[in-house]
């Protein structure tokens, strides 16, 4: 039985001093109409809340945790380095070490600039692309999230007479800021071709999640990424891959290595910080040399490349080269996903479960396939909400939004997966009778 007395009290206090009671909206669990989990500590695959409830965690810090929570090696390196100083506002050797390591693992990154968040990474990457190409228009995909910079916080305008234009998904964003942001459905190559036909000399870049992780887990159709690469080559536009979620999650070389399609600029975050705040963008030297102080594209930050995030990330990335690590992660995910599919089928609950590597999402739908934001938006919200809340009562913590992926870490053991499968089976039986 889940207890909530301390959680309820603290959440009331949080809402008095923090907008909505949280410092990032998804943490509020508003989508599932539930009070949030207020974490107290974590270890391995587990989260413990302030009421001492224990959860098997599949949020995994929104994908940032791949080795499990509170990894001893990483935390020991953080503690050891912090005795030298927390931040210097100067270049440190550890920045050079992690930059070299990332470049070694991801060959398309010949130079890299460290920042503090994914938003800073994508914002800076697009500024760089616009400067390098001397073009202004950018293409993003409906439902793909690339941070909260004004010109990226947009989805499609549904007006059939205003194709490819964008609507802000936040108040406070003037419409004219989005005049150069063009939106297409994910996996719809024909729409991209039409945009290039309309603006053949004006597209600075395409920014894409190689695997969409912010409308659940949605995979690219066969040759979709290849076609984007070829189109950018043809029109002298840059291809930016937002690998903030997929970088070091899908493979040691990211999704680009898995699909063998390489971008001009890559955005990274989450895993490369080893659990601490970080972001980065990198690419070919001929492009990256345009970044200040080498070039005219300005980017700066007091905490960019701060040594504590750098040592944390470096320690994490060193561990990821362990032989068979990704194979183990993938096998765990395949086992869990196959059993969840089987259980849903046995209970006559129509679902699509998308997965790749250690990412997965459960969609309650009668569709055969989920391949874009429109498909995700058509899914059965009521079933998702009921599933989330009922399985949470059993100590399983999935992502609290239909539009966020779930993740598995190296520390999820067979017993954790089996408990998750057994709990899901119980909840599918409830869904069968209730919805």
UniProtKB/Swiss-Prot annotation:
Disulfide bonds: none annotated. InterPro entries: 4pyrrol_synth_GluAld_NH2Trfase, Aminotrans_3, Aminotrans_3_PPA_site, PyrdxlP-dep_Trfase, PyrdxlP-dep_Trfase_major, PyrdxlP-dep_Trfase_small. The modification N6-(pyridoxal phosphate)lysine is found at residue 270. SUPFAM superfamilies: PLP-dependent transferases. It is an enzyme of class 5 (isomerase). Its main location: cytoplasm. The keyword Manganese does not apply. One of its GO terms (cellular component) is cytoplasm. One of its GO terms (biological process) is protoporphyrinogen IX biosynthetic process. It is found in: Cytoplasm. Belongs to the class-III pyridoxal-phosphate-dependent aminotransferase family. HemL subfamily. NCBIfam families: hemL, PRK00062.1. Homodimer. This is Glutamate-1-semialdehyde 2,1-aminomutase. The lineage of its organism: Bacteria, Pseudomonadati, Pseudomonadota, Gammaproteobacteria, Enterobacterales. The gene is hemL.
């Amino acid at each position: 039985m889940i207890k909530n007395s301390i959680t309820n009290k603290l959440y009331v206090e949080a809402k008095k001093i923090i907008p909505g009671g949280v410092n990032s909206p998804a943490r509020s669990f508003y989508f599932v109409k539930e009070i949030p989990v207020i974490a107290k500590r974590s270890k391995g695959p587990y989260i413990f809340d302030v009421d001492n409830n224990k959860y098997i965690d599949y949020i995994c810090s929104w994908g940032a945790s791949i080795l499990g929570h509170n990894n001893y090696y990483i935390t020991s390196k953080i503690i050891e380095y912090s005795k030298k100083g927390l931040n210097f506002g100067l270049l440190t050797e550890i920045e050079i070490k992690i930059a070299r390591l990332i470049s070694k693992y991801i060959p398309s990154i010949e130079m890299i600039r460290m920042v503090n968040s994914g938003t800073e990474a994508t914002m800076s990457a697009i500024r760089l692309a616009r400067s390098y190409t001397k073009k202004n228009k950018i293409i993003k995909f409906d439902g793909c999230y690339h941070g909260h910079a004004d010109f990226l916080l947009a989805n499609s305008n549904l007006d059939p007479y205003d194709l490819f234009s964008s609507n802000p998904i936040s108040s406070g964003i003037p419409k004219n800021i989005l005049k150069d942001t063009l939106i297409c459905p994910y996996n719809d190559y024909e729409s991209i071709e039409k945009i290039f036909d309309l603006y053949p000399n004006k597209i600075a870049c395409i920014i894409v999640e190689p695997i969409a992780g912010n409308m659940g887990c949605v995979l690219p159709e066969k040759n979709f990424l290849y076609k984007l690469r070829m189109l950018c080559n043809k029109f002298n536009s840059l291809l930016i891959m937002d690998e903030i979620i997929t970088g070091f999650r899908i493979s040691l070389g990211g999704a680009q290595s898995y699909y063998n399609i390489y971008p001009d600029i890559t955005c990274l975050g989450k895993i490369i910080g080893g659990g601490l705040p970080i972001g980065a963008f990198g690419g070919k030297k001929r492009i990256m040399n345009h970044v200040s102080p080498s070039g005219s594209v300005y980017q700066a930050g007091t905490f960019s490349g701060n040594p504590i995030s750098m040592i944390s990330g470096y320690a994490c990335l060193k561990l990821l080269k362990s032989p068979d690590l990704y194979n183990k992660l993938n096998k765990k995910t395949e086992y869990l996903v196959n059993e969840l599919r089987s259980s849903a089928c046995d209970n006559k609950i129509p679902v699509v479960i998308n997965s790749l590597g250690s990412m997965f999402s459960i969609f309650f739908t009668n569709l055969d396939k989920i391949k874009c934001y429109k498909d995700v938006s058509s899914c059965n919200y009521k079933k998702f909400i009921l599933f989330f809340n009922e399985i949470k009562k059993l100590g399983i913590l999935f992502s609290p939004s239909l539009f966020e992926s779930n993740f598995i870490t190296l520390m999820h053991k067979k017993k954790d997966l089996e408990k998750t499968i057994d709990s899901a089976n119980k909840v599918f039986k409830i869904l069968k009778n209730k919805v």
